[in-house]
Amino acid sequence: MVDMDRISISLPTNLLAEFDEIIEERGYASRSEAIRDSIRDYLIKHKWIHSLEGDRAGTISIIYDHHSTDVMEKLTNIQHDYEKLIVATIHMHLDHDHCMEVVLVKGDASDIKELTDKLTSQKGVKQVKLTVMVPGGNIPQ
């Protein structure tokens, strides 16, 4: 038997309600098993992102609450710190409270990962998705 630790987390009511619907829909035996599965998926994604090497091009998509204290200023300052990596940005208003920013990047994978981590860790950021590709000349034939 695997050793288990018991933890406690706080979640917004609507997030937990939506998670519980998925748990029921997918037929999980318990909320704990669904959370373990979600953590496994997160760990796999993290390992994949951090195994990337070499020259890459891609997008970093960010959804954030623009009412959150200084989030827009912080995201802009971080982007200015990586101006050699960032090719372009696109900003879109999703609704009254949320914006989406798509950052086009090209450069070393380690720098792209570092930028992604800094953007992800900001208060007010709801979701970040990194998509990377091998630049055209490096695509296997």
UniProtKB/Swiss-Prot annotation:
Molecular function in Gene Ontology: DNA binding; DNA-binding transcription factor activity; nickel cation binding
Note accompanying the cofactor annotation: Binds 1 nickel ion per subunit.
Role noted for this protein: Transcriptional regulator.
UniProt protein name: Putative nickel-responsive regulator
Organism: Methanococcus maripaludis (strain C6 / ATCC BAA-1332)
Entries under Pfam families matching the protein: NikR_C (PF08753), RHH_1 (PF01402)
Family to which the UniProt record says this protein belongs: Belongs to the transcriptional regulatory CopG/NikR family.
Superkingdom to which the source organism belongs: Archaea
Cysteine pairings via disulfide bonds: none
Cofactor(s) annotated in UniProt: Ni(2+)
Keywords: DNA-binding, Metal-binding, Nickel, Transcription, Transcription regulation
CDD domains for this protein: RHH_NikR_HicB-like
GO BP field: response to nickel cation
Gene3D superfamilies: ACT-like. Chain A, domain 2, Met repressor-like
Binding site for Ni(2+): H80, H91, H93, C99
